[in-house]
């Protein structure tokens, strides 16, 4: 009988220790810094069609047939990805119609412009393939796409290598009431594009944004740079809701001109 009681006591002690350890571990987790995962996402509402892929998250607009925004974090390691598969532009099966298709861009005179660029997604064949989905694509002027926009993309990768990672949100801007359209599904042609960047430095968070007209733009990134606050005021959206507001009110170009 005494042996039986001893066994029961040992079992109870083990259970109590397990529970105590469990609460201790939970406390340790809660004491850790908040993960940066998801910090690249802008504020969004419950009625937006949010699409999550390996390399980016997008909010797809079924009226414009363009993403309202595309967000991703690019790390230093990801900039050296070696994946180089060739993939077709495709509609995204994860979103319902109406949505853009290849036929909309055929002979339109507009580039299929990546928001999250192919070069940022070469760390994974899946991420690379998904960068060609139309939830990541907008009609872009060819010169702007290959000149001004490309230079901003290259600057972004340099910042990821320099600072370890960069948070990125970009997308189209529609200024005019009467939008240009292309294709049988009437994909709206953006008037401008924005791109907002944030990096963590020893002096705190640093941000910058760019606004580029969707025409024959060839300028340097500096010529399009504005405070993130300026873009947020136009869009009516907080692009980096987890960051301090003061980090978005101005930019120090010396941080980005490297």
Regions found by a protein language model. Give the residues of each.
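Domain-level detector for secreted/extracellular nuclease and nuclease-toxin modules, and
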Residues: 3-10, 16-258
